[in-house]
Amino acid sequence: MMKESLSRGMLRVAMCGCLLCGGIPLAAQTQEYLSAVWSPDLGNGMYKNPVIHADYSDPDVCAVGNDFYLTASSFSCVPGLPILHSKDLVNWKVVNYALKELVPTDFYATVQHGRGVWAPSIRYHNGEYYIYWGDPDFGVYMVKAEDPAGEWSEPVLVKAAKGIIDPCPLWDDDGKCYLAYAWAGSRAQINSVLCVAEMNAEGTKVVGPSRIVYDGNDDVNHTAEGPKFYKRNGYYYLMFPAGGVQMGWQMAARSRNVYGPYEARRVMEQGDTPVNGPHQGGWVQTASGEDWFVHFQDKGCYGRVTWLEPMTWKDDWPVVG
């Protein structure tokens, strides 16, 4: 960041000087005007947030052995669904894009700012990586690949609907597959509602009725969205943000039955620092059993940057931060 700025008059003088002398040699430019590269790795086993100081909205992450893969919303950008890889959850590198073009192609043949890929989830199941995302105008799509850095399949429309967003699959111990998702009030005229529906075992089609499992309109946890679906110690968990992007907090809801009833509590508060959020993200466990939570913070013109938080469990409830 520049430590001082030029007034308009000084800027005119500087520009005239450049015209007269033919430009200022690069060597004459001082170091104080060069931007530093952001590095979250402090080099001593510690890190600082954000771990990704760039616009990766609604991140989700999965672990396979010692490899971590992250994807995020790409909206109407092409290629879409960036795939980032890391060995330590701190140092990330873009290795691929899972979506070559948006579908339906005729609709996205023209600019559709803010539409497209909303809040994807990434999972590993039976030797394949799956990414699900919601298009608020068309429904839930899925792509899959054996190698995240390789070729991804063509998108499959898992559930056609207007207003469904933030989908996340869960393969249960008995082989059944479920989909959790939220609603966009701008399309469906409802929000703060989380639903679960059964899919076929392949995860390619919703085959059962949708059931409301959490209604944030009935309590103080409004604007419930972005559910991530997990199972641990016999409990089904929905981890999701509430309260809004800039003023919200993290929630967890759990039940012994996939369709509920779910009991819910806050697991990470807003806090009283200038840092807003925490907003949408996901839980990941390392090969050594450590638990971490990745989420985004809305940083205005810098975009939605990615934070990494330690996570523990107490009485079968997650504790984030």
What does each model-found stretch correspond to?
Residues 2-14:
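Bacterial N-terminal signal peptides that target proteins for export
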